[in-house]
């Protein structure tokens, strides 16, 4: 077995624990990482189900590159989204783009279709037949997944998600799309941190050799300060919409804290 199916036993166990159809979890694994547990996205999402560091921590995942921890963490997040929204399609949108629907860009909106294509490849007529392990039952009702012919796929149980013919795309998911659309405000800090690190390294690498050759430590300090200033200013202009959005969301909390402090004074 290759791709997501090499982790089928763990997928089945995690699906049983969180009352998920294992085909749904396998589809997410295939879409996010093609079954490679060392996959890392450009914005820091990690492992088989591409968990962001903050998300992994909140789910109790201490090593996102550990296949078992990652799959259980991703399954827990899918269960949380299914409980929140009540249908698979919206749960997948939130898995990819976060819970703020205003930030669901074009690639997030295409994400459920990619997952379903991979499910059909893995379990439909064009893919290998895999029988779930004993005791692993698909969820029922609106959350049930059904393997069907991809060429005329319409799934009422996925809020009418319709897909046309085409080859499955294994390059999508968080590792291939985050950073190319609006980033949920609560992920801005990680996104900016990654960009800041790359920009700082590029600036300092460009000037470090001649400065070190000159042996001028004072000049080296000035260069580092200038590099930091350039990075900060550049990042603000690059991410000003996201930063301003995050700041605006913090204003009400700040006002409330100020009012509380004033009342206690």
UniProtKB/Swiss-Prot annotation:
Residues of the region (Slt-type domain) are 19-98
- Short name of one Pfam family: SLT
Keyword RNA-binding listed? The answer is: no
This enzyme's EC code(s): 4.2.2.n1
Instruction: Cite the GO molecular-function annotations of the record.
Output: lysozyme activity; peptidoglycan lytic transglycosylase activity
Question: Quick one: a GO biological-process term for this protein?
Answer: killing of cells of another organism
Active site residues per record: 32
Lineage: superkingdom: Viruses
Disulphides: none
Which stretches are transmembrane?
Answer: 219-239
Keyword annotations: Antimicrobial, Bacteriolytic enzyme, Capsid inner membrane protein, Degradation of host cell envelope components during virus entry, Degradation of host peptidoglycans during virus entry, Lyase, Membrane, Transmembrane, Transmembrane helix, Viral genome ejection through host cell envelope, Viral penetration into host cytoplasm, Virion, Virus entry into host cell
Annotated catalysed reactions = Exolytic cleavage of the (1->4)-beta-glycosidic linkage between N-acetylmuramic acid (MurNAc) and N-acetylglucosamine (GlcNAc) residues in peptidoglycan, from either the reducing or the non-reducing ends of the peptidoglycan chains, with concomitant formation of a 1,6-anhydrobond in the MurNAc residue
GO CC terms:
membrane; viral inner membrane; virion membrane
Q: What is the main EC category here?
A: lyase
Matches recorded under Gene3D superfamilies: 1.10.530.10
As for family, the record states:
Belongs to the transglycosylase Slt family.
PANTHER family, per the entry? MEMBRANE-BOUND LYTIC MUREIN TRANSGLYCOSYLASE C, SOLUBLE LYTIC MUREIN TRANSGLYCOSYLASE-RELATED
Assembly and oligomerization: Heteromultimer composed of proteins P7 and P14.
Q: What is this protein called?
A: Transglycosylase
Q: Upper lineage ranks?
A: Viruses, Varidnaviria, Bamfordvirae, Preplasmiviricota, Tectiliviricetes
